[in-house]
Regions:
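Bacterial N-terminal signal peptides that target proteins for export
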Residues: 2-12
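Bacterial N-terminal signal peptides
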Residues: 10-20
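Acidic, polar-rich low-complexity tracts and alpha-helical solenoid repeat scaffolds
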Residues: 25-332
Length: 332
């Protein structure tokens, strides 16, 4: 089964670029769409995307089937992989905690489940009209699955594709100039403006893909590439509020990996404001305390160690937080 869907990535991406409009292909350039043998005699629904308009009844059907049969199931499988990785994770509170409470070295071992996510995502794209509202979600899930398998080059391909294919466009299909004041854009903006309101629907996933691209860079310690994108998003007024917690997370992660403890703690503390009061939040508060302690700021370290105590449902974490708070208080 895996041999079927790995080659399909190129076909689906090339097909999407061809269908999107005149900015996607050069004049006179014919795009070939090689299919795996199992699909050679079949015209996929995605290949019929350009055949006529997708009217409201058809779009409702495409959205419903793609969402509940494919996007929902792929998301559930992906969450299960992460949950299992978290369940086997064990922290040593006597040392600096890892940034995440799971490891990619663990998630990559769950390759069968992640391959199933990739299969669900690629099938959901191939078997449905590309103009439905969930195609970008499926491309994103596909990329995340590759990231969790530590197939960073393949993940990069998907995230970059989302960034390109779903970039802002003019009515005639041509790209707006991103990061420039031309075409009515803001010169400092690279993010996609998201619709707001009750009827806005599922937000476009291009902005999410930018965050995952940063995570992908940082997993490979490609700090220069991550820094350029981070700096652009930090000052981008268009970047949505719903992803500010994620942005603060990857900024903190970047500083953490470079052992810039004070800055890592500052942005981790900002990230905490968007997290529910759970044991995971308590763990991150403890980590923030550790980072401030490493930076020599014992007052801030005590504050976050103390915050972790009432939020923790883990007795060991609660005890270690109390001990750490007493330790830095005495050091002060």
């Amino acid at each position: 089964m895996r041999k079927v869907f790995v080659p399909l990535i190129r076909s689906l991406i090339m097909l999407a670029l061809f269908i999107k409009g005149p900015a996607s292909a050069q004049m006179g350039f014919k795009i070939e769409l090689p299919k795996p043998e199992e699909y050679e005699e079949r015209v996929l629904r995605s290949e019929k995307t350009k055949e006529g308009k997708l009217r409201l009844p058809g779009k409702v059907v495409q959205n419903t089937v793609t969402h509940f049969n494919y996007t929902y199931n792929a998301t559930r499988k992906l969450n299960d992989v992460l949950q299992k990785a978290k369940e086997v994770h064990r922290d040593d509170y006597a040392t600096l905690l890892p940034f995440y409470n799971y490891s990619l070295s663990v998630t990559r071992k769950d390759s069968l489940e992640l391959d199933s996510v990739i299969q669900k995502a690629s099938s959901g794209i191939a078997l449905h009209d590309l103009r439905n509202d969930w195609t970008d979600d499926l491309y994103l899930l596909w990329g995340i699955a590759y990231h969790l398998q530590e197939k960073f080059d393949s993940a990069h391909l998907l995230f970059q594709f989302i960034n390109y294919y779903y970039a802002p466009r003019e009515k005639d299909g041509y790209f707006k100039t991103i990061g420039s004041a031309r075409d009515g854009n803001k010169a400092t903006s690279i993010a996609t403006t998201e619709k707001k309101g009750v009827f806005a629907g599922d937000p476009a996933k291009r902005n999410d893909a930018l965050i995952w691209e940063i995570r992908n860079y940082l997993a490979q310690e490609q700090f220069a590439q991550a820094a350029g994108l981070l700096q652009a998003l930090r000052v981008d007024a268009t970047f949505p509020a719903r992803l500010r917690t994620d942005l603060n997370e990857v900024i903190s992660l970047s500083f953490y990996k470079q052992q810039k403890w004070d800055s890592a703690a500052f942005y981790l503390a900002k990230m905490l404001t968007g997290i529910p009061n759970t044991n995971e939040k308590a763990r991150l508060e403890y980590l923030t305390g550790q980072l401030y302690e490493l930076a020599g700021n014992n007052g801030a370290a005590k504050l976050f160690y103390t915050k972790a105590i009432p939020h923790s449902t883990d007795l060991i974490l609660e005890i270690q937080s109390r001990i750490a708070a007493i330790r830095v208080d005495r050091s002060s």
